[in-house]
Amino acid sequence: MNKYTASVVGGSGFTGGELLRLLTQHPYFEVVQATSRSKTHKTIGNVHPNLRSVDLRFTDPSELESVDILFAATPHGVSMQQIESFTAAADTVVDLSADFRLNSAEQYDEWYDGHACPEYLEDAEYALPEINRSNLVGASLIASGGCNATATILGLKPLFDADILTGDEQVVVDVKVGSSEGGAGGGDASSHPERSGVVRPYAPTGHRHEAEIEQFLGLSVSFTAHAVEMTRGASATCHVFPSEPVSNSDLWGAYHDVYAEEPFMRTVAGGGGVYRYPEPKSVAGSNYAEVGFERDPENHRLVIFSAIDNMMKGSAGQAVHAANIALGIDETTGLEFTGLHPVGAP
């Protein structure tokens, strides 16, 4: 079996570790390089204890090898500075940061601090495979969607496809996220004594993932993010106010039409048992996303739920999913793990 050679730039962070976990078990990828400025020459297992069996050491990112595909798991701002060296080293580049998710330099001026290489934005394909799979086939520069944006878009998109929403309605989104979203260098707010027991609003307004949601869905959302005491996970609760009454069968039909054939989507709405709605714990460690809904006819409101593992469906898993599609590999390859139950705090 011919394998694609792969490198992971920024392999010492949480997301880099998830990429290495997935890629070293993937039958069509051979990881030949993982880079880290801070962990150069250390073994992969020294940094990621679950990968102690991986016989590879971190190298300096200035020493990129030529590979078939390069995954960049670097903080925002790094990939845009290094994109020329990335594209010179690899035929396909998958970037997990926000550096190529938006379409224009003007958007980066508004939401970030500008863009160092705006000429690359036109060629970048935003990766949310359930929604824009065809755009990823053969793509050479892929921008993996942000975790909060992914959860929100997956929850809301079927309502647009079914004309339940048009883009003129009020949409309020409340996302609760785990500490791993802050990365391995998350700072004081992510340390255990400060994080333990909290439900902390950290982006009441102006969260940068709003830009991805608005770009993809074509509507303005009122978005608030809370940090909560879990390690993995993003749980989005979306309150929408459609102009016309919506029945339960309308909702089931909308979500069935979009997601029934999707290998990593599960619709969970009511029913019996403990897990009656989407919950991050149910998808921890997997590339699955769960979506669900509840009607509130008295207040002309729909409550839409979405749950993902922020480091998998919201990052590394989505990146590998997109890479599979780009290279013509069966898209579920290397991503079949369904999660664990029971499991402790994710």
UniProtKB/Swiss-Prot annotation:
CDD domains: AGPR_1_C_LysY, AGPR_1_N_LysY. Residues 178-198 are annotated as: Disordered. GO terms for cellular component: cytoplasm. Keywords: Amino-acid biosynthesis, Arginine biosynthesis, Cytoplasm, Lysine biosynthesis, NADP, Oxidoreductase. Involved in both the arginine and lysine biosynthetic pathways. HAMAP family: ArgC_type1, LysY. This is Putative [LysW]-L-2-aminoadipate/[LysW]-L-glutamate phosphate reductase. The gene is lysY.
